[in-house]
UniProtKB/Swiss-Prot annotation:
It catalyses: D-glyceraldehyde 3-phosphate + phosphate + NAD(+) = (2R)-3-phospho-glyceroyl phosphate + NADH + H(+); NADH + H2O = (6R)-NADHX; NADH + H2O = (6S)-NADHX; NADPH + H2O = (6R)-NADPHX. CDD domains: GAPDH_I_C, GAPDH_I_N. It comes from Saccharomyces cerevisiae (strain ATCC 204508 / S288c) (Baker's yeast). The active site is at C150 (nucleophile). NAD(+) binds at R11, I12, D33, T120, N314, Y318. The record marks H177 as: Activates thiol group during catalysis. PANTHER family: GLYCERALDEHYDE 3-PHOSPHATE DEHYDROGENASE (PTHR10836), GLYCERALDEHYDE-3-PHOSPHATE DEHYDROGENASE-RELATED (PTHR10836:SF76). This is Glyceraldehyde-3-phosphate dehydrogenase 1. Present with 120000 molecules/cell in log phase SD medium.
Length: 332
């Protein structure tokens, strides 16, 4: 059994918990969040406005949340270095705080006794891995790794398939992205990003994203060939990537569809999905794929210039990849 601890019990932390509980080879041992009491932690596991009520039983005592009869130790420690990961024999600490996302800060989990750390955010210093794209390049000497971002997890599998089959000369990505916790319910101060301070539920908000450039970190052959931006839109979950690329080799749209479908049914099964149905965003709520190619939504201008569309549940699909990466690094 892989013994894990979750630091940070927000959207991703709670969904990683839900998904990890479904895996037979993972045991969730502990949860740490300095801002959440046990009764409130249990409440937030039980009720979720986006993904629905937890179908099992949830309760708590003074030192645990209890899910389906399994006791999970709880802590309210601000400094991860003070957590008892050593005595709890933690194999992998999952850091989903968004705070301890660099090698020097995530090291606190190692200092506390965890064997390895998976960061659920992009990192400028920790090596980034996208399951299905470059995870097999992981080596056990890397104690701290990043699972990159939800958008990179959607874009990278598609970009890899297209680049391997036809070559990408250059490309631009736009993600039409659901609201997240960093946004405002009404107009408020946001000194670094003025647009980001505007009300999330009533606006389409242009925003920056490093997701496309990050693909170059997980696929070095695409370094410098992709960049992108985001539009934040008033939906609670599920986002969509629009990848517009100039190909190196000529291709028909049918050839592109066949290449993506072959990957989705073969080496990227479970990570990359494929659909030809007339779908909309809510159809992917709770989908565990990192990226679902929408074959009927893409368009082609010329044999080397295409726009490709891929959906992703930016919460659930991403959290599923976090759990996959936990399994991979723990067993490596």
């Amino acid at each position: 059994m892989i013994r894990i601890a979750i630091n940070g019990f927000g959207r991703i932390g709670r969904l990683v918990l839900r998904l990890a509980l479904q895996r037979k080879d993972i045991e969730v041992v502990a949860v740490n969040d300095p801002f959440i009491s046990n009764d409130y932690a249990a409440y937030m596991v039980k009720y979720d406005s986006t993904h629905g009520r937890y179908k099992g039983t949830v309760s708590h005592d003074d030192k645990h949340i209890i899910i389906d009869g399994v006791k999970i130790a709880t802590y309210q420690e601000r400094d991860p270095a003070n957590l008892p990961w050593g005595s709890l024999k933690i194999d992998v600490a999952v850091d989903s705080t968004g705070v301890f996302k660099e090698l020097d800060t995530a090291q606190k989990h190692i200092d506390a006794g965890a064997k390895k750390v998976v960061i659920t955010a992009p990192s400028s210093s920790a090596p980034m891995f996208v399951v299905g794209v470059n995870h097999t390049k992981y080596t056990p000497d890397k104690k701290i790794v990043s699972n990159a971002s939800c958008t990179t997890n959607c874009l990278a599998p598609l970009a890899k398939v297209i680049n391997d089959a036809f070559g990408i000369e250059e490309g631009l990505m736009t993600t039409v992205h659901s609201m997240t916790a960093t946004q405002k319910t009404v107009d408020g101060p946001s000194h670094k990003d003025w647009r980001g301070g505007r009300t999330a539920s009533g606006n389409i908000i242009p925003s920056s994203t490093g997701a496309a450039k990050a693909v170059g970190k997980v696929l070095p052959e695409l370094q410098g060939k992709l960049t992108g931006m985001a539009f934040r839109v008033p939906t609670v979950d599920v986002s969509v990537v629009d990848l517009t690329v100039k190909l190196e080799k000529e291709a028909t749209y049918d050839q592109i569809k066949k290449a993506v479908k072959a990957a989705a049914e073969g080496p990227m099964k479970g990570v990359l999905g494929y659909t030809e149905d007339a779908v909309v965003s809510s159809d992917f709520l709770g989908d565990t794929h990192a990226s679902i190619f929408d074959a009927s939504a893409g368009i082609q201008l010329s044999p080397k210039f295409v726009k490709l569309i891929s959906w992703y549940d930016n919460e659930y699909g991403y959290s599923a990849r976090v759990v996959d990466l936990i399994e991979y690094v723990a067993k490596a």
